[in-house]
């Protein structure tokens, strides 16, 4: 009944994804990365995603080996519109986009003795903790996200209401990227709603444990949640 009565959801998703794929098409001539590598998620290149707002630590704050680099020459950053391995002649500001000031580009040679958090004119695109929730590496990526959203997410939103669901969803999504921005590899772009959806999974687990004795088949429900985690995590664990 839910699926039959809510036909508009897939139209909204389709329009949203078509809008997201328009920008990569303008930059590289194709909405899907096919050169120099093929994106198995059927989506744009990581450089396009960085330019669109993916979590990319060098765009957000000073990074060891970037701002304090004093050997090996200045870093040549890939250009957002690159379709080859040779187009590595952009500045960090050009890669990051969003009108990042040129004065925030790393200066070579950097100062090895100055603490990273005290560098002047360091990048500060803090909104990259939020924007990546709405970006995805490709159609397969958003497909797995929507699968979980329309199963466990739907049931939890009905149970707790849209306002509480909204608060949990975005809190988990934002702080997931905060943790990734502090502890994940600094040179990898990250996108997607995995952090938000793992918050939804946590709510489902809490609900299961609180109502364990009232359920007809609690172990079956628990197994279903574990299956969702396994199916959802492995295809996207390198993206988010």
Which role does the model predict for each range below?
Residues 5-9, 143, 166-170, 225-226:
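Hydrophobic alpha-helical transmembrane segments
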Residues 1-133, 218:
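N-terminal signal-anchor transmembrane helix
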Residues 162, 206-223:
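Alpha-helical transmembrane bundle and helix-membrane interface signal
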Residues 219-220, 236-240:
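C-terminal transmembrane module of eukaryotic multi-pass membrane proteins
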